[in-house]
Amino acid sequence: MIRTFFAALLIALPSAALAQAKSCIVPDALPELRAEAPPPGQIRKVPVTGYLLSLSWSPQYCRDKQGNPADASQCGKDARFGFILHGLWPEGDRQIDPAWCGEAKPLDAGLVKQHFCMTPSARLLQHEWAKHGTCMADKPDRYFRAASILYRAVRFPDMNALSRRGVTTGVFAAEFARINRGMTPAMVRIMTTPGNWLKEVRICMDTAFKPRPCPKGEPTAPPKRRLNIWRDER
C-alpha cells in the first residue's frame, strides 16, 4: 500500500525550481561514502502510518560553522541557503518509527550531486537513505526523487521580514501554513535551539503524502514563545 502511494506521488507531482538555494555550487569531488550500519537495537520494521518532511533553517545551522571545512559546501563563503531538506521520514504509531529497514550501500556520486542543492551534505544524504529511505523505497533514486518533489512543493514565507518583525512560534506556524494550500498550523511543528532560535520546520503528512494534523506527542516549541530567526546578511 505504501509503495502504491509512493509511486503515485512520483507521477502526480511535477518538478519545480529550487527556490531556497540562493547560491549553491555542487563540488566536483565528494567525500568517500561508506555503508552506515544501524546502531544496536535500532532496526525497526514497523508499519508506516505517516511521514514527516523536515526542513532545516540553514542560516541558523551555519551561524557558527562558516570556517569549518567539513561544512564548506553549505556554510562557506560561496554558499547561501534558506531552508534545506533535512529529510523525509516515515512514521509509525506511538512514536515508534520505522528505521534502518535494509542494506544501504554507498550512494552513487551522480545521485548525490543531483540532489546536493536540496541537501548540501553527501554524508547526510547517505544517512537519510540508510535510516529512513530504506523503509520507504527499494532504490535510493526513488526515495530522493519523492523527497525532492515534496520539498519543491513547499512555499516559504519571507524570512527576512518575519525575522525583523519579531513573531511567536504560533504566529510563524500560522504564516507558514497560510501560504501553503491545504495546510493548517496544526500540521506544522517548529523546532528551536535552547535560545529559541528557529532550527527546523517539520510538516506532518499522511500516507498519501498530504499534510495532516500532527499526531499527539510530536515535539514542537510552545506557540506563545517568541521565535528568534537568524538572518544570513552576506
Per-region residue spans from a language model:
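Bacterial N-terminal signal peptides that target proteins for export
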Residues: 1-6
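Betabetaalpha-Me/HNH-type nuclease active-site subdomain
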Residues: 37-121
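A generic structural micro-environment signature
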Residues: 7, 59, 91-95, 135, ...
